[in-house]
């Protein structure tokens, strides 16, 4: 019996010792973990302050950036205005060159009336005519893409400079035909040039906006030209006055379509102007 009692006593002591051992170890580990958490919580703000807390709160940064808008030093608006200025200068130059070339073709037929010393030079036009034509070309060339984007009417053909150059060649050819060819009467001349001008529009444009703007440009430009003639600012030779009125609207129509195609080609690949809400 004593031996059995000793056996039970030793087993119970060992069991109690084993039960008391792990709680002490777990308590020590828990205390160590709590100490580490306290150290991290104390040193965390200082680390965030040292690194500037880049990812602490990204939402306020996004809101502040959205409210502030584009930065003043952003090159995008300047690039847009720079490209607009480039397009305007190119269209102005095209208008000046076309005015000089077409006026030279008409002088060969003695349609325009200038002093002999002016006609003897290649710049055989009144000084204000080429700048006015250049300004009109810049306005028309910038207006065509704006109307297209406003109406949402895409162009029916693939834009390429080869097509634009062919359009310019046809336009110059129409002017050359009006200066060189002889017709039986002015009605025949008007119908022929009208057919050629509509053919130019159908071949290189085919847009309703192009047709409407071409007709509007032809009407307004013819009206302004006749106003200048009646007030003595610009003169035509008397025998050809009816001849001038017969071909002038067709020339202005085809010129508007041609300059519009140039403006559309220049506007390709240009990003839209940024809007701020």
Swiss-Prot record:
Changing residue 207 to A: Abolished phosphorylation by PCK1, does not affect oxysterol-binding, does not affect the interaction with SCAP. Residues 108-126, 183-185, 232-245 are lumenal. Residues 51-66 have a biased composition (Low complexity). InterPro entries: INSIG_fam. Keywords: Cholesterol metabolism, Endoplasmic reticulum, Isopeptide bond, Lipid metabolism, Lipid-binding, Membrane, Phosphoprotein, Steroid metabolism, Sterol metabolism, Transmembrane, Transmembrane helix, Ubl conjugation. Oxysterol-binding protein that mediates feedback control of cholesterol synthesis by controlling both endoplasmic reticulum to Golgi transport of SCAP and degradation of HMGCR. Acts as a negative regulator of cholesterol biosynthesis by mediating the retention of the SCAP-SREBP complex in the endoplasmic reticulum, thereby blocking the processing of sterol regulatory element-binding proteins (SREBPs) SREBF1/SREBP1 and SREBF2/SREBP2. Binds oxysterol, including 25-hydroxycholesterol, regulating interaction with SCAP and retention of the SCAP-SREBP complex in the endoplasmic reticulum. The KxHxx motif mediates association with the coatomer complex. This is Insulin-induced gene 1 protein. The lineage of its organism: Eukaryota, Metazoa, Chordata, Craniata, Vertebrata.
């Amino acid at each position: 019996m004593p031996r059995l009692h000793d056996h039970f006593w030793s087993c119970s002591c060992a069991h109690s010792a084993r039960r008391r051992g792990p709680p002490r170890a777990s308590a020590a580990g828990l205390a160590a973990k709590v100490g580490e958490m306290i150290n991290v919580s104390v040193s965390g703000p200082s680390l965030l302050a040292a690194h500037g807390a880049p990812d602490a709160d990204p939402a306020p940064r996004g809101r502040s950036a959205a409210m502030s808008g584009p930065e003043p030093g952003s090159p995008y608006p300047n690039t847009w205005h720079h490209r607009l200025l480039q397009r305007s200068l190119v269209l102005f130059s095209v208008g000046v060159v076309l005015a000089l070339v077409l006026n030279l073709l008409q002088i060969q037929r003695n349609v325009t009336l200038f002093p002999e010393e002016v006609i003897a030079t290649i710049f055989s036009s009144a000084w204000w005519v080429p700048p006015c034509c250049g300004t009109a070309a810049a306005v028309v060339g910038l207006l065509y893409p704006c109307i297209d984007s406003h109406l949402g009417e895409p162009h029916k053909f693939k834009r390429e400079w080869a097509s634009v150059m062919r359009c310019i060649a046809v336009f110059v050819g129409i002017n050359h035909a009006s200066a060189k060819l002889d017709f039986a009467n002015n009605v025949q001349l008007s119908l022929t040039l009208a057919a050629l001008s509509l053919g130019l529009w159908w071949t290189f444009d085919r847009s309703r906006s192009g047709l409407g703007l071409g007709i509007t440009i032809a009407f307004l430009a013819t009206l302004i030209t006749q106003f200048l003639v009646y007030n003595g600012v610009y003169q035509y030779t008397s025998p050809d006055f009816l001849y001038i009125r017969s071909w002038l609207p067709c020339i202005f129509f085809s010129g508007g379509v041609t300059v519009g195609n140039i403006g559309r080609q220049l506007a390709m690949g240009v990003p839209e102007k940024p809007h701020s809400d």
